[in-house]
């Protein structure tokens, strides 16, 4: 347990602000923690949360991040190695080709759930559709956007989940 705390503290005290140094540092930490797609997650994080273009990430090796940006990056690394899902960190997941806001109030939509959309597309259209336990609202929203049902409702007993679903509408 102490080793983990020391490890986590050393992450927040990394001294370089150079983008390339930070990327290499993150990749090294992730590879040691068996995060298999760590390189891709780092790129996505830099694009989504620090608004860096892929060109900047791949070619501007001398770019210096501001201290605030560096701290965001290091916190991302810390959260990831502590097991927090990547989608919660960037507050985004893709479902059926559309980005949805997610946070710990909702489950991250599973790719397998997209099969429900495929089945409904073949069998529909329907007059009504009800998504019980709507969470992020992804299923109800995709059903509505694809005109699979004339009227779609999403229900959830969790008010925070309903806030997320409403935000995604």
Question: Where are these predicted regions, by residue range?
Answer:
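N-terminal auxiliary segments of SAM/dcSAM-dependent transferases
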Residues: 2-90
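SAM-dependent Rossmann-like transferase core, predominantly class I methyltransferases
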Residues: 59-61, 67, 71-148, 152-167
């Amino acid at each position: 347990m102490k080793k983990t705390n020391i490890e986590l503290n050393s992450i927040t005290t990394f001294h370089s602000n150079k983008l390339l140094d930070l990327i290499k540092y993150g990749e090294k930490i992730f590879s040691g923690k068996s995060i298999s797609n760590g390189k891709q997650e780092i790129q996505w994080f830099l694009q989504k949360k620090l608004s860096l273009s892929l060109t900047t990430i791949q070619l501007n090796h001398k770019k210096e991040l501001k201290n605030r940006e560096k701290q965001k990056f290091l916190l991302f690394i810390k959260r990831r190695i502590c097991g927090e899902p990547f989608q919660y960190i960037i507050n985004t997941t893709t479902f059926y080709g559309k980005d949805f806001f997610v946070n710990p109030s909702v489950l991250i939509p599973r790719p397998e759930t997209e099969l429900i959309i495929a089945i409904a597309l073949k069998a529909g259209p329907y007059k009504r559709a009800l998504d019980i336990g709507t969470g992020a609202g992804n299923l109800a929203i995709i059903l509505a956007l694809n005109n699979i049902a004339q009227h779609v409702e999403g229900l959830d007993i969790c008010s925070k989940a309903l806030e997320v679903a409403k935000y995604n509408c």
